Amino acid sequence: MNPETLKFIEASIKTIPDYPKPGILFRDITSLIENADAFKATIDLLANHYRDQGITKIVGTEARGFIFGAPVAYAMGLGFVPVRKPGKLPRAVIEESYALEYGTDTLQLHTDAIVPGDKVLVVDDLLATGGTVDATVKLIRRAGGEVVDAAFIISLPSLGGDARLTAAGVKVVSLVELPGE
């Protein structure tokens, strides 16, 4: 990946201190997607990086994974598969629950969206603890798909998501790594 393009992408991400609460450094990707050149560079970089890797589907997690996953799928001429919270998908689904700081949450995938043999790229905006993408990977594998990589615009390695996904056998690719709280 082109280092100058990566620096341009990183520079387009604003950091908001003490949001949503004191002590948090919020990484705001809306500043990236508001900038047409930065948004295009991000999509092109991911699509070009994965174009010749035999990927058959792009999966994005609700909701910001849709922002990046769908245009990457379009640029690669592939289908896009949304993984959503319960009650948002109209056909038969499989689901996976995962732990949150206080409680649990659940994600769902249409049962016919991934078929055995699909080679899948998971795309999301930010990797923190890895819980959402870990649950997404489990759904894809249960459906018979192979997760090639999980790609993120931003990774906060200090929060453990990189290690969690690597331990689950998932290669993590991040365009920008930042310290995280």
Swiss-Prot record:
Q: Which domain of life is it from?
A: Bacteria
PROSITE patterns reported for this sequence: PUR_PYR_PR_TRANSFER
Print the organism lineage.
Bacteria, Pseudomonadati, Pseudomonadota, Gammaproteobacteria, Aeromonadales
Q: Does the keyword Glycosyltransferase apply?
A: yes
Task: Indicate the principal place this protein occupies in or around the cell.
Answer: cytoplasm
Family annotation (Gene3D superfamilies): 3.40.50.2020
Q: What GO CC terms are in its UniProt record? A: cytosol
Organism field: Aeromonas hydrophila subsp. hydrophila (strain ATCC 7966 / DSM 30187 / BCRC 13018 / CCUG 14551 / JCM 1027 / KCTC 2358 / NCIMB 9240 / NCTC 8049)
**Which keywords does this Swiss-Prot/TrEMBL entry list?**
Cytoplasm, Glycosyltransferase, Purine salvage, Transferase
Offer one example of a GO biological process linked to this entry.
purine ribonucleoside salvage
**Subunit record text:** Homodimer.
- Segments spanning the bilayer are none
Please indicate if the UniProt record lists Transferase as a keyword.
Answer: yes
CDD domains listed in its UniProt record: PRTases_typeI
Q: By its UniProt entry, which SUPFAM superfamilies does this protein fall under?
A: PRTase-like (SSF53271)
Q: Which reaction does it catalyse?
A: AMP + diphosphate = 5-phospho-alpha-D-ribose 1-diphosphate + adenine
Q: Which family does it belong to?
A: Belongs to the purine/pyrimidine phosphoribosyltransferase family.
Q: Which InterPro entries does this entry report, sorted A to Z?
A: Ade_phspho_trans (IPR005764), Adenine_PRTase (IPR050120), PRibTrfase_dom (IPR000836), PRTase-like (IPR029057)
What this protein is called in its record is Adenine phosphoribosyltransferase
Q: What is its EC number?
A: 2.4.2.7
MF-aspect GO terms:
adenine phosphoribosyltransferase activity
Q: What does this protein do?
A: Catalyzes a salvage reaction resulting in the formation of AMP, that is energically less costly than de novo synthesis.
The protein's annotated pathway:
Purine metabolism; AMP biosynthesis via salvage pathway; AMP from adenine: step 1/1
The record's subcellular location field reads:
Cytoplasm
